[in-house]
Amino acid sequence: MPELSVITANIDSPEWAELLVKSIRKFTSIDYEIIIIDNGSLPKNLIWLEKQEDIKLIKLSSNIGHGNAMDLGTQISRSKYVAFFDVDSHVQRPGWDKELIELYSGDDKIKLIGVIGPEHKPLHPPLFFYEKEFILENNISFKYLPRLSTDTAQKAYWDILNMGFKVERLEKGEKIYNCIGDEIHLNGKSTIYHMWYGTRFNENNPDKKKDKLDGYALEEHFKNKKQLFEHPKVIEILK
């Protein structure tokens, strides 16, 4: 039985999914499983994922949303701990897995580890780390509820606090990559990188793009994506 389930929600983002998966393989030392909830990608964008024997790929016919994918992934996971990543995030260094477990288990009050969000929401979605049993036993959902929250897992944040527990929020810090995005720090080190709007303009399936970027914004999107995938550390992960 694996100790950690690494889960992400994917839709038509093959290059981001590959980078995340390969970073998990490279930098994870404990026993783990990888679960990818695919929200209706085109067949051409699943070719690489379908060839990976160590990935449990759940292919859905339509997009159930990020929060629903978190709930589904948690339910089918087999591990004590769950690390749910944005698909356009990846791990930057070894030790991340044991350090998150140490942080979580070091305080009985901590029931969710996330990332400090912008002013209008308490959490940012590059990473959520939690214990499966606690989430399921307390019927905590990560669904996006428009009237109650501003993004995925915001209600879960308040539900956990209202139960008398704590949510540990990791900070963003100094960057290794010179790209638009956040580098999440753990124990003072860059540990997880999250590309801003990495999947917002979906060149792999333009019909499903979430936001229409044009002009300077579109130019910056592709420039930063190119810079990231040409960075020596990313090239090393993708080998």
What role is predicted for each listed range?
Residues 1-22:
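N-proximal low-complexity "stem/linker" segments adjacent to membrane-targeting elements
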Residues 38-46:
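A conserved acidic beta->alpha catalytic loop
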Residues 60-76:
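Glycine-rich, basic loop-to-helix element that forms the pyrophosphate-binding segment
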Residues 82:
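Short aromatic/hydrophobic "clamp" motif used to bind/position activated sugar donors
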Residues 92-159:
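Conserved catalytic core of nucleotide-sugar-dependent glycosyltransferases
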